[in-house]
Amino acid sequence: MYNGKDRAQNSYQPMYQRPMQVQGQQQAQSFVGKKNTIGSVHGKAPMLMANNDVFTIGPYRARKDRMRVSVLEKYEVIGYIAAGTYGKVYKAKRQINSGTNSANGSSLNGTNAKIPQFDSTQPKSSSSMDMQANTNALRRNLLKDEGVTPGRIRTTREDVSPHYNSQKQTLIKKPLTVFYAIKKFKTEKDGVEQLHYTGISQSACREMALCRELHNKHLTTLVEIFLERKCVHMVYEYAEHDLLQIIHFHSHPEKRMIPPRMVRSIMWQLLDGVSYLHQNWVLHRDLKPANIMVTIDGCVKIGDLGLARKFHNMLQTLYTGDKVVVTIWYRAPELLLGARHYTPAVDLWSVGCIFAELIGLQPIFKGEEAKLDSKKTVPFQVNQLQRILEVLGTPDQKIWPYLEKYPEYDQITKFPKYRDNLATWYHSAGGRDKHALSLLYHLLNYDPIKRIDAFNALEHKYFTESDIPVSENVFEGLTYKYPARRIHTNDNDIMNLGSRTKNNTQASGITAGAAANALGGLGVNRRILAAAAAAAAAVSGNNASDEPSRKKNRR
């Protein structure tokens, strides 16, 4: 019968009760260990000191600077697109380096000829040897079929057969040029470099963190990030158009309504992107036509997440972090009334304002913004609230039950009573679809609790009961093309980055090398000791120089 107690006792026998063979093996192992530790201290192997260059900060930083790839080394800047409070956005394309070969094959006329490779360093089994034989046979047949002789690679059909065609026809098509948008954040004020580096802005940190986590076809895709000369460069996929440009095209020089089918497609894709943000607990807080991009293939993408913020498990209130959010014309009424906490409904109000602007070709609530005073006090936006009341009417407790709870509620009592004029405005702007007007009412609801959310807005009759289904391409069915985005090529201040970076890298390398030579290649610990010794010597020297004066004073 199995006895667990006996097994436990056998497992933990004292050393003297174990078989002599085991003890002999342990003695032999201990003897070998002692034999290998001859010349060591207390039987321990001596520590091998690493190369001092590893612990030297100067050469390490210089080496990292030399290895770092500059944004201008990887991208060719064509010009800048727009400028704002955060900095500038540039249009760029990838640099083409025709002199280097790729890892998969050599470069042929700007393209990589990929031939299956086999790693000869790995142990080969029978199946792997058969695979290699098949690969070699395939390679020989490929060269034979293409008329390629060793040492000569042909890229035209003329070299293959003289009876084919006298005109050269390239087998490999040249790839299309892919453009990118580089967003450079400001580090200088009024063209003068700051004396003290204040670090990366909060807006840049939020945008980098969120763009690295969020992935949706209706959000601008972040390609990579560069940190160069204390400046952040964020590389995005390029979008040829934005809603502000499209609205301007239809409103100048004379008004021409945007096709209803195009408006429906834009709104559906926009709401789909907003729904994705809200389902991932992210508020955008700056939705406006200028931040809604449209690619050349008609895909709507939401950009500029500089004011975006997660609203799940917050450490502080939304008002504490940012007291002013959303551009004034697209700001929700609860924000105008001083709400300290708000919901994703503020984004849906902005979407409603964008919807109205696509219909009327101008902002529906175009108020004048009151600026901050010298004390940086947030002013009450009287004119903006008045523009909203003139179109939607004056709210009351029946429409907005918690209206009296807002800090700036008393401001509403100062206005005269307005009636609802949204339907009148809609028909005067040329709107004919009753479902579009219904969705507009749901998006521009005063009460943020009753305001429709993005998920339910996608199921609205405006999208589900239309004669023409929603298209994934907003340009589908158009007989005209929108002009390309205007690029400013006369103000490429980012081009000065390359020469300054190169000079600074060389200077830092020289300075670091000189410092390392002066200290004799000392490691970090020895450098600290040397500095401490120098400081002690300086102090003792000062004390010795002060000693004669003290003696004179005593006399």
Swiss-Prot record:
GO terms for molecular function: ATP binding; cyclin-dependent protein serine/threonine kinase activity; metal ion binding; protein kinase activity; protein serine kinase activity; RNA polymerase II CTD heptapeptide repeat kinase activity. The keyword Transcription regulation applies. Its main location: nucleus. It catalyses: L-seryl-[protein] + ATP = O-phospho-L-seryl-[protein] + ADP + H(+); L-threonyl-[protein] + ATP = O-phospho-L-threonyl-[protein] + ADP + H(+); [DNA-directed RNA polymerase] + ATP = phospho-[DNA-directed RNA polymerase] + ADP + H(+). Its EC number is 2.7.11.22, 2.7.11.23. Keywords: Activator, ATP-binding, Kinase, Magnesium, Meiosis, Metal-binding, Nucleotide-binding, Nucleus, Repressor, Serine/threonine-protein kinase, Transcription, Transcription regulation, Transferase. Belongs to the protein kinase superfamily. CMGC Ser/Thr protein kinase family. CDC2/CDKX subfamily. Component of the SRB8-11 complex. The SRB8-11 complex is a regulatory module of the Mediator complex which is itself involved in regulation of basal and activated RNA polymerase II-dependent transcription. The SRB8-11 complex may be involved in the transcriptional repression of a subset of genes regulated by Mediator. It may inhibit the association of the Mediator complex with RNA polymerase II to form the holoenzyme complex. The SRB8-11 complex phosphorylates the C-terminal domain (CTD) of the largest subunit of RNA polymerase II RPB1 at serines 2 and 5. This is Meiotic mRNA stability protein kinase SSN3. It comes from Saccharomyces cerevisiae (strain ATCC 204508 / S288c) (Baker's yeast). The lineage of its organism: Eukaryota, Fungi, Dikarya, Ascomycota, Saccharomycotina.
